[in-house]
Regions:
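Substrate-access "cap/lid" subdomains that shape
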Residues: 208-250
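Non-transmembrane functional regions of envelope-associated proteins
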Residues: 2-220, 253-293
């Protein structure tokens, strides 16, 4: 009788776990995956530098967001040999009138701008590099959004590239472990920010996507080797990289991918990752290097 009561108790406990979490296997898999990420030895990355708009910069330049002629000033002072990735959304005209100054600075540098998915319908989708599709239609597999917040034409037409900063947190943990390289918005396909950074970095002009009966199989940047993805065009992000971080007030190094983002307290929302909270531009840096390596 004791044996049967033990079995019954075990069944009740397992049923309770199943009700509390309909997919305990998935949760265990996430725990294992996160532990693996946390145990990896950090690798120093030399070709990507995080440029932080930090407390010192806010104190010097004033409340954020800044007038865009201030951003233009830092671009003008930086080396022409670097690639500038601005992980901020310029979807409306600068009320201080700095757009023309930023546009002129962008003409002198290689700059990639950000867009962001939105739940609001949007007309038109800005200036993006298109994605050629091979095989099956991937429409039912790609993450789809009603619209995009995209940079104003004054800026996007001066940029080398524009990409979407889409990340899909895993349920039920809310942790970002992977990111889509291609998304759909307003009925069309668009590259992620990290993917477009790689396109500009490699000097390629276009993308292609191969899909089959089970979803997306790979994405290719120009003539580069295909990047194998899951069915939803996602890749896992390797978070064991270590990047040099500098203030935007510091001299900007040359021959680097410079990824700009806000770290000043109260101005940015950190993203949950398997190794702890990170600022959004740091997540982008890990994603870029994951694909590079």
């Amino acid at each position: 009788m004791t044996k049967w009561w033990s079995v019954l108790f075990t069944i009740v406990i397992l049923a309770g776990i199943k009700i509390w979490n309909p997919d305990p296997v998935k949760s265990l898999r996430y725990i294992q995956y996160d532990f693996f990420q946390q145990q990896q030895e950090q690798v120093q990355v030399d070709d990507i530098v995080l440029v932080n708009i930090d407390e010192k910069a806010i104190q010097q330049e004033g409340q954020y967001p800044w007038p865009r002629d201030i951003v233009a000033k830092y671009l003008n002072e930086g080396p022409a040999e670097s690639l500038y990735v601005l992980n901020m959304i310029y979807s409306e005209d600068d009320r201080f009138g700095g757009d023309q100054a930023l546009r002129e600075a962008m003409f002198l540098k290689a700059v990639v701008l950000s867009s962001a998915p939105t739940t609001q319908l949007s007309d038109g989708v800005g200036n993006f590099v298109g994605v050629a599709t091979l095989g099956k239609d991937p429409k039912g597999w790609l993450y789809e959004f009603p619209g995009l917040l995209f940079p104003i034409d004054t800026l996007s037409t001066a940029a080398y590239g524009v990409g979407a900063t889409a990340s899909i947190p895993d349920e039920p943990t809310g942790v970002v472990r992977r990111a889509p390289l291609i998304i759909r918005a307003s009925g069309s396909q668009y590259p992620s920010l990290a993917l477009d950074v790689l396109r500009v970095y490699t000097g390629e002009p276009s993308y292609s996507l191969k899909a089959g009966d089970n979803g997306v199989e790979w994405i290719r940047i120009g003539r580069q080797d295909p990047i194998v993805t899951d069915s939803f065009a996602q890749v896992p992000i390797a978070y064991w990289n270590k990047f040099e971080q500098i203030s935007i007030l510091d001299p900007l190094p040359k021959d680097k991918v410079l990824i700009f983002g806000v770290t000043a307290e109260g101005y940015s929302n950190p993203v949950p990752t398997p190794v702890g909270a990170m600022y959004p531009h740091e997540v982008q840096a890990h994603l870029v290097h994951t694909m590079l390596s």
